[in-house]
Amino acid sequence: MGSMAYLTFMTGGGALTAVVVQYLRHQPLSDIYRLPVRVIVAGFFGVALYTVMLAVAFGLAPSTDIGQINLLNYLWPVWMVVLGIIFLGNRPKVILVITGILMGLFGVLISRGFGLLTHPPLNILPPALATIGGFLWALYIVLLRKWKIPEEKGGTAFHFAVCAIIAGLTAVYLKEWQSIPPWSGPMIFWIVVGAVGPVGIAFSWYEISVKNGPVFLIASLSYFIPIGSSLLIGLFFKETMNKGLIFGAILITFGAWLVRSASQEKIGNTP
């Protein structure tokens, strides 16, 4: 199954899962689509377009570069800190923040291997898409916090429904619907896992937490995701596994600790 066809099913199922989450939390279902215009616009770029860009980046990148594309995407906690300073008025200790950010960037650079300068990527489009997409996602999250959007006005279902439409139309353009393999148990399993877990439930809960919790702490904790995801990618894409991949993920995590140490935001703060 092509990447856009799979993304259509995954994000469409994720949107339906987010509706179920809204219902189980006893929140009005009408709030799913009655969103402020600015949230709809920001979510188009920060959720729908970001997800499509990341999928395209993974699809275009050679297997040896998958790990680096993944870590470039996970620079969004860095962008959250920078954008938090700009839009939220946070004033962390600048030297520690810069040190943490540089460690994260260096971690990404070496994640492809220690021969980056002698063997640069042949195609810069995948890393560019992953980097820009991660920035758009971070901007969306910070703007939600700045605008103090009510918790019940969750845009996850709406934005992923839009994403499913974009992915579906892209799959039409790429003629992926004409080459879908016969349905099988493993295919259905991965669609359901992707839709219910990382898209439907995880995004819904993350959006709720970032509206109410300390954005610097959330950004810092998010840094621990790269280690787990890098291990999984190394498991499924053995060509991308190298000493630099795990070391780079560890550097990003340590950079997160520095950024968190630099933050002057208290854990109990709410908007």
Give the ranges of each region predicted by the language model.
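Membrane-interface helix termini and inter-helical loops of multi-pass transporters
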Residues: M1, L29, F58-P62, S111-N123, ...
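Hydrophobic/small/kink-forming positions within alpha-helical transmembrane segments
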Residues: V19, G43-A48, V52, P77-V82, ...
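Hydrophobic core positions of alpha-helical segments in small-molecule transporters
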Residues: F9-M10, A42, L72-L75, T99, ...
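Hydrophobic transmembrane alpha-helices of multi-pass small-molecule transport proteins
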Residues: A18, P92-G115, Y223, L232, ...
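Specific transmembrane alpha-helical segments of multi-pass solute transporters/efflux pumps
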Residues: H26-G67, I110, A195-G213
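Hydrophobic alpha-helical transmembrane segments of multi-pass integral membrane proteins
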Residues: S3-Y23, V37-V41, L96-F106, L125-I132, ...
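Specific alpha-helical transmembrane segments that line the substrate/conduction pathway
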Residues: A5-L16, L54-R91, V215-L235
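Intrinsic disorder in cytosolic terminal tails and internal cytosolic loops
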Residues: S263-P271
